[in-house]
Curated annotation (Swiss-Prot):
It comes from Rattus norvegicus. Residues 1-82, 381-409, 526-577, 613-692 are annotated as: Disordered. This is Lebercilin. Residues 112-301, 449-480 form a coiled coil. Residues 54-73 have a biased composition (Basic residues). The gene is Lca5.
Length: 727
């Protein structure tokens, strides 16, 4: 291959018109003119001579040349001998070319050519080696690539093997764990098998033993069990027989209970109907009572007072309320006094019936509280009426609802509801009873409220009468100084001397008992009656003009208040009559002197108050003279009547001032309806209108005629009060 490449190179050089050695020749023989033309054999000798002349330069050029010189064929060598050198060598040497080189130069040139050929051969060999090395390098590179590829595959295979080994190890551990568990289960199963085999062996042994025992007929335990079985069967028969008997008794008792329940149901219906009738009757009587009250307010304003009984009487009344249902209606309606049975008469005040005493509290202190209490009672009465109406509606609605529901319910439920209904009715009756009792108390308080205004008028009239009596006494003392040694006028008796006298306890007075009961333990020593404490006062001080709103009598200033509740009229009547009987002798002696001085008193009254006051003073003096003449004859009768028939009453506990021991002057100022004495003018009869009332049915009212004395004590007016029963 190297030879082919060299020949191809030479051919190319030939085609280009250049010789591979032309450079050498041109450098050596540059002055020849035929250097540019084709080589000829004629020109070769001078070229050879030039080469021989400059061998060193040729060698230096030869060393400078590159190794790219190719191998020249031997045929081309003689053709190039005659070629002239180029213009370069000619210009450098400036020597003429020799046409015939010598032999030495030829030899040198031939050696040079040989050397060149040798070197070219070496180059070609080296080129061949280089090509072989390149091919070998390519083969090695391809081999290396294939080896690297195979190596990478091998490495991948190694990695897969490690993963496979890891997975295999995990599977091995899992299988080992399963093996361990299965071995444990197997051991446990073997243990259970052993236990079951042992138990089976024991059961077989016990079964054989029991079979042997069962085959044995005559055993003591078998006999005992047989006896127990027989006794149990007998007991079972007895219990069954008893159960049958008890079931029969139960049926009979249920039948009787059904009959009894039906009877009780009928009674309950009857009681319900009767209750409705009684409620209607109660409402009718309530309306009737209201009408009677209105009539009493119109006809007789003094007959509407309802006193409160003593604590003992209240306890008895409470027992009656608990024992019988009809008693509470009687007690509630007993306070109503009709105008047909009893028409009390009004009696004017007289000076003999005036009883005054001091009180630690004035009426103005507790009057507002009493009025507030009356207003609360009025609101209570209104709420009471509304609750009664609501309860009536509720009972009617309940009856209608139960009547509708009876058809859809079973018999047992219906009976149970009937019993509950009877209980509800009884509770409703209890509530109505309480409400009626409260209504009675409200009525009493309303009666008291109606009399407050009347008491004020009576108190004013009492003031005027007491002023007249005091003025009469002052006038008598001024005109007749010798009368100071005489006993006081009966208009203003010396109550203080009577209260502290030693023979007071011997007289049949009922003041102490009644006052102790009425005023919560207050004794009479706490009170001081209207009497001049200092008789030695100067007339100027006594005759000092009194203010218009109150009257002053010596050191006493009377306080007039409204009556809080029921007073104690029988005890007051007794005390008044005792006082009249004791003072009758003094009245008979002083009556003539009093008549002679009444004209002077009238003139004094005209100077102070006008003609109306003088007229009232003359009327009072006239009534006093007539009463004194009659009281002398009736002393014994009044004492016996009052001492025998005076019940003890208590002050109304509803009034707030009574709980603290307040003493109302009008409790003893009995001219407010309780102890008035009227003169015998032939038109009306003398009668004490008692503000209280006794609930004792054993007491009887004293009948009086015109032949009896003027002053008559009336014990009770229970027969004159309409008693309504709901039986």
């Amino acid at each position: 291959m190297g030879e082919r490449d060299q020949s191809s190179d030479t051919d190319q050089e030939r085609k280009g018109g250049k010789h591979p050695y032309s450079s050498h020749y041109s450098s050596d023989f540059g002055s020849s003119p035929q250097s540019s033309g084709p080589s000829s054999p004629v020109n070769t000798p001078p070229c050879a001579s030039n080469r021989e002349k400059n061998p060193k330069r040729h060698l230096s050029d030869h060393h400078v040349r590159h190794q790219t010189v190719r191998k020249v064929s031997p045929k081309a060598i003689p053709n190039k001998k005659g070629v002239r050198v180029g213009f370069r060598s000619q210009s450098l040497n400036r020597e003429p070319l020799r046409k015939d080189p010598d032999i030495v130069t030829k030899r040198v040139l031939s050696a040079r050519l040989l050397k060149i050929t040798e070197l070219q051969n070496e180059v070609s060999e080296l080129q061949v080696k280089l090509a072989q090395l390149l091919k070998e390098n390519k083969a090695l590179k391809s081999l290396q690539y294939r080896q690297e590829k195979a190596l990478s595959k091998f490495e991948d295979a190694e990695n897969e093997i490690s993963q496979l080994i890891h997975r295999h190890n995990g599977e091995i551990t899992a299988l080992k764990e399963r093996l361990r568990k299965s071995q444990e289960k197997e051991r446990m199963a073997e243990k259970r098998v052993k236990d079951t085999e042992g138990e089976l062996f024991r059961t077989k042994f016990s079964l054989q033993k029991l079979k042997k025992i069962s085959e044995a007929r005559h055993l003591p335990e078998r006999d005992d069990l047989a006896k127990k079985l027989v006794s149990a069967e007998l007991k079972l028969d007895n219990t069954e027989r008893k159960i049958k008997e008890l079931s029969k008794n139960l049926e009979l008792s249920t039948n009787s209970f059904q009959r009894q329940l039906l009877a009780e149901r009928k009674r309950a219906f009857e009681a319900h109907d009767e209750n409705k009738i009684l409620q209607k009757e109660l409402q009718r009587l309530h309306h009737k009572l209201k009408e009677k009250e209105k009539e009493l307010d119109i006809k007789n304003i003094y007959a509407n007072r309802l006193p409160k009984s003593s604590p003992k009487k209240e306890k008895e009344i409470a027992r009656k309320h608990a024992s019988c249902q009809s008693d509470f209606t009687d007690l509630c309606t007993k306070a109503v006094q009709t105008a047909e049975d009893f028409e009390p008469e009004e009696f004017p005040f007289t000076a003999q019936t005036v009883l005054c005493y001091e009180n630690r509290w004035d009426g103005s202190e507790y009057l507002p509280s009493y009025l507030e209490y009356q207003e609360r009672n009025e609101h209570g009465s209104e709420s009471l009426s509304s609750t009664l109406e609501q309860e009536g509606k509720y009972s009617d609605d309940q009856d209608s609802c139960t009547a509708k529901q009876e058809t859809g319910k079973s018999e047992c439920e219906w009976e149970r509801e009937e019993l509950d209904k009877v209980k509800g009715k009884s509770s409703l009756l209890g509530r109505t009873e309480k409400l009626v009792l409260e209504a009675g108390s409200v009525q009493t308080e309303s009666y008291q409220a109606q009399t407050i205004d009347k008491f004020q008028d009576e108190a004013e009239r009492l003031k005027t009468e007491m002023l007249l009596a005091k003025l009469n006494e002052i006038n008598k003392e001024l005109q007749d100084p010798q009368s100071l040694s005489r006993p006081l006028l009966p208009l203003l008796p010396n109550f203080e001397s009577k209260l502290y006298s030693p023979d007071r306890s011997l007289r049949p007075y009922t003041f102490s008992e009644s006052l102790d009961r009425s005023f919560n333990g207050q004794h009479l020593s706490d009170m001081s009656f209207l009497t001049p404490r200092d008789e030695g006062q100067s007339p100027g001080l006594i005759r000092s003009p009194a203010p218009s709103d109150e009257f002053s009598f010596g050191s006493y200033v009377p306080s007039f208040g409204k009556t809080p509740g029921k007073s104690n009229p029988p005890s007051q009547k007794n005390s008044l009559l005792d006082f009249q009987s004791n003072m009758s002798e003094g009245l008979s002696k002083d009556s003539l002197d009093f008549i002679s001085r009444k004209e002077k008193k009238a003139t004094l009254m005209e100077q102070l108050f006008g003609t109306s006051a003088s007229a009232s003073a003359t009327n009072t003096s006239a009534s006093t003279t007539t009463n004194t003449t009659t009281n002398t004859n009736t002393n014994t009768n009044t004492n016996t009547n009052t001492n025998c028939n005076v019940p003890s009453k208590s002050i109304d506990s509803h009034f707030p001032a009574a709980s603290r021991g307040d003493l109302d002057p009008l409790h003893f100022l009995s001219g407010d309806r309780s102890s008035r004495v009227r003169e015998p003018d032939g038109e009306d009869e003398d009668l004490f209108l008692s503000e209280g009332r006794s609930f004792n049915p054993n007491r009887h009212r004293l009948k009086h005629t015109s032949t009896k004395p003027t002053v008559t004590a009336v014990d009770s007016i229970d027969e004159d009060i309409e008693e309504v029963t709901l039986r």
